[in-house]
From Swiss-Prot:
A zinc finger (RING-type) spans 10-57. Keywords: Metal-binding, Zinc, Zinc-finger. The lineage of its organism: Eukaryota, Metazoa, Ecdysozoa, Nematoda, Chromadorea. PROSITE patterns: ZF_BBOX (PS50119), ZF_RING_1 (PS00518), ZF_RING_2 (PS50089). The keyword Zinc applies. SMART domains: RING (SM00184). Pfam families: zf-B_box, zf-RING_5. This is Uncharacterized RING finger protein ZK945.4. The keyword Metal-binding applies. It comes from Caenorhabditis elegans. A zinc finger (B box-type) spans 101-147. Gene3D superfamilies: Zinc/RING finger domain, C3HC4 (zinc finger) (3.30.40.10).
């Protein structure tokens, strides 16, 4: 039986079995195993409760004289459905093939334009794929037939070979043209600027690939931001060690009257809730950015699946979507709140139940030689927490850190002090200092102290000062303090960093 041409049929009436028509449902005669349709079984049975098989005369008893009580032959029904599915697949493949032929796409590589047809393989192939597939000796004898691009709808017999570059035609999705369109005064593309169709396609595919790569890069950054925000939120847990330390600070530095302690703890918890709420709002903003990116990525993926000719027609739509990913979908840098461990519990002396959680200033200090800034802070501050290395300088709390956890993430209270000696003359040292400043997006404030500042420096120092001035214009958070050679200047730098 040819499965693509015939369906299983009843051996008595010759009609095809069908589950949709009651009389054509295949029924099994259980005593002998033969199958006939429901209609034939009813006719043979008549008024009797016994049916004799028309093929071998073996009798089968029917319960309550109802032939529908006989079991269906599901094997035949499954074969019928499989045949139907296979026919539908063949039709679908043929329709798909026609669509690809219409758009001139290579069957092996949809990014390429088909230029040859193989009748034996029933495939449209570009020159590269033809050579690769037919390099095997058993396929080398296949006949190659040249195929052309679709004809122009306005000039029959002329193949589409050009693409209109006018913005108006892009927006109207009317870009495909032949050589006659350019010369015909009645044409929509008369004397329009144009490009070759075969040059346009690779450029569009490259734009798709680069924008998808940029999407994955931005997605990674946003997910990193969300992860960092969640890490900080976790530090504010009431069951965590940092919050337990804050409650101890409250008990250690302030005496509360009877009944005030519980109220003070409640006020402290409310402060925590406020900070967590801000962090959660920042996460929701990052998620909105991610959703916008994903929406545009999905649009590009959908466009990339189009046949080449349709993709060329919709270039304007592709360009707009790519622009949204490349320019409009900037990764917003969240201004992270300090985590719970770096916050100080501050109780106002006049109002003991007005409690604040204030982040300690975290200072990263990069000095060229003598660590004068570190020594000044150590001599003019009081250590209030050995565990978290918190110092009190005047009325402010600060912590000296070695380096930031992530130089690309802005963080509350994070400050940088950099001291540069202009008499050093070391070009590499100047270059490293500038490089560090350019990448210092994480810092809330940056103080650059210049030692031995005077007119008439060497070439290396002069170049450094010029580039530093440019950086200062681009990054207002940079403050420059000159002539850092006395303790008063060091004090000015420290005070400048924590205001």
């Amino acid at each position: 039986m040819n499965m693509l041409r015939c369906f299983p049929e009843c051996g008595i009436c010759g009609q095809e079995y069908s589950e949709d028509e009651k009389l054509l449902i295949p029924r099994i005669l259980t005593e002998c195993g033969h199958t006939i349709c429901t209609g034939c079984a009813g006719k043979i049975k008549g008024q009797s409760s016994i049916i004799a098989c028309p093929f071998d005369r073996i009798e089968t008893r029917i319960w309550k004289k109802d032939v529908t009580r006989l079991k269906k032959n599901f094997s035949i029904l499954e074969i019928k459905q499989e045949v139907k599915d296979r026919k539908n697949r063949v039709i679908s493949e043929k329709n798909e093939k026609k669509e690809r032929n219409k758009n001139g796409v290579c069957d092996e590589n949809t990014n390429h334009h088909a230029s040859n047809y193989c009748e034996t393989c029933d495939a449209d192939l570009c020159e590269e794929c033809w050579t690769w597939i037919h390099s095997i000796s058993t396929l080398a004898h296949h006949e190659k037939k040249m195929i052309s691009t679709p004809d122009c709808q306005f000039h029959p017999g002329k193949s589409i070979s050009l693409v209109c570059m006018r913005d108006r035609c892009k927006k109207r999705q009317n870009r495909l043209m032949c050589s006659e369109c350019f010369l015909d005064k009645c044409s929509d593309h008369f004397e329009h600027e144009h490009s070759s169709l075969h040059l346009e396609l690779p450029e569009l595919r490259r734009n798709i690939c680069s924008s998808l790569a940029l999407y994955h890069e931005k997605e990674k950054k946003i997910l990193a931001n969300i992860g960092k925000l969640r890490e900080i939120i976790a530090t504010y847990s009431y069951d965590g060690e940092p919050f337990f330390q804050k409650k101890n600070e409250l008990l250690r530095f302030r005496h509360f009257e009877m009944g005030e302690m519980d109220q003070a703890i409640k006020v402290l918890e409310n402060e925590v809730v406020k900070r967590v709420r801000v962090l959660e709002y920042k996460i929701s903003n990052q998620k909105l950015d991610l959703d916008w990116l994903q929406k545009n990525k999905d649009a590009i993926v959908k466009l990339s699946a189009l046949p080449n000719m349709k993709l060329v027609q919709r270039k304007w739509e592709l360009e707009v979507t790519v622009k949204r990913i490349e320019k409009d979908s900037a990764v917003r840098r969240p201004e992270f709140l300090a985590d719970c461990s770096t916050c100080i519990v501050h109780v106002l002396s006049q109002r003991p139940l007005q409690i604040e959680m204030i982040p300690a200033f975290r200072l990263e200090i990069r000095e060229c030689h003598r660590n004068e800034v570190r020594k000044f802070i150590e001599n003019h501050s009081t250590r209030i927490s050995s565990r978290s290395n918190i110092l009190r300088y005047n009325c402010d709390f600060l912590e000296i850190i070695d380096r930031t956890e992530d130089l690309t993430i802005y963080s509350e209270g994070l400050r940088l002090i950099m001291i540069v000696d202009l008499l050093d003359g070391d070009r590499d040292r100047y270059f490293v200092a500038l490089e560090q400043l350019e990448e210092a997006v994480a810092y809330e404030k940056i103080i650059v102290g210049l030692k031995s500042y005077s007119r008439g420096h060497g070439e290396a120092a002069s170049n450094f000062l010029t580039k530093l001035a440019d950086l200062h214009n681009k990054m207002p958070k940079i403050t420059v303090v000159v002539n850092v050679d006395r303790s008063e200047d060091i004090e000015k730098i420290v005070n400048e960093s924590i205001i």
